[in-house]
């Protein structure tokens, strides 16, 4: 077992170093080690990677980050090749250490005051019409980073007046009132916050987070902006059951959420939580049917679905899986 480390500000800690401080340890069993990816999870890489390299170059030029890269998303090649990306603001170091996530943990540096302007210019240069903005958790900031989100939204709209903006926000733990005061004054076009999984496994999957708190965040934003869609996503394969997923879907509807994403959890490294099961495309189709019957206006359900995967198509109600 790794020993706890003394964190230095601005240093990214990953894998064993990141997991050393998690209270619920990941003990991999022989059965879990033998669990193999099914054929439907094999990814075909594009033959032409020039668009991918172009987006990466634009990010590096302006000192920006994408969650696609930082979280090792399996859809990176597809999304970058189609000219889309999910921008991650407030740095690339998270104050949380969720054992399903590949984003680095540590003591983050002070937010870049020029990031909103650089982000807006990059989006204009890329000619994007729909953009997703997310962030690491910033428990070190008094507002959890809410003002930085608002500054980014304002800067993007100033340079790109017709663009649609979706924000995928953290839970603003202990700062909900302050954060919502800011975000309701400068709202996005879609407000997204992921529950990630079912409440029974929260202590293991989302240490430091609270299921009811996350539901309340979604509900309160919706109450302030009834006409703005709220959205949430879950991963399957972390020990939950399909029945528990359906119950979470009911909870989301009871809290006013109308957009849903369901995707397969994939283990980033052997130090992360192991995959407990692989859910078939047919099961995802069944969950989508249940979601639509509950009253969700949009439900993207499939093995490769992530909360920002083809988010522009999701917002239009087009089929995504």
UniProtKB/Swiss-Prot annotation:
Subcellular location: Cytoplasm
GO molecular function, a single term: metal ion binding
Record domain Radical SAM core: where: 80-297
Keywords assigned by UniProt, alphabetized: 4Fe-4S, Cytoplasm, Iron, Iron-sulfur, Metal-binding, S-adenosyl-L-methionine, Transferase
Top enzyme category: transferase
SUPFAM superfamilies: Radical SAM enzymes
Residues engaged in binding [4Fe-4S] cluster 1: 68, 73, 79, 308
Membrane-spanning residues: none
Keyword presence, 4Fe-4S: yes
Pathway recorded for this protein: Protein modification; protein lipoylation via endogenous pathway; protein N(6)-(lipoyl)lysine from octanoyl-[acyl-carrier-protein]: step 2/2
Pfam families: LIAS_N, Radical_SAM
Origin superkingdom: Bacteria
Cofactor note: Binds 2 [4Fe-4S] clusters per subunit. One cluster is coordinated with 3 cysteines and an exchangeable S-adenosyl-L-methionine.
Residues involved in [4Fe-4S] cluster 2 binding: 94, 98, 101
Cited SMART domains: Elp3 (SM00729)
EC number from the UniProt entry: 2.8.1.8
Cellular component GO terms held in the UniProt record: cytoplasm
Entry annotated with the keyword Transport: no
Record's catalysed reaction(s): [[Fe-S] cluster scaffold protein carrying a second [4Fe-4S](2+) cluster] + N(6)-octanoyl-L-lysyl-[protein] + 2 oxidized [2Fe-2S]-[ferredoxin] + 2 S-adenosyl-L-methionine + 4 H(+) = [[Fe-S] cluster scaffold protein] + N(6)-[(R)-dihydrolipoyl]-L-lysyl-[protein] + 4 Fe(3+) + 2 hydrogen sulfide + 2 5'-deoxyadenosine + 2 L-methionine + 2 reduced [2Fe-2S]-[ferredoxin]
NCBIfam families: lipA, PRK05481.1, PRK12928.1
Record family assignment: Belongs to the radical SAM superfamily. Lipoyl synthase family.
Annotated protein name in UniProt: Lipoyl synthase
Native source species: Yersinia pestis
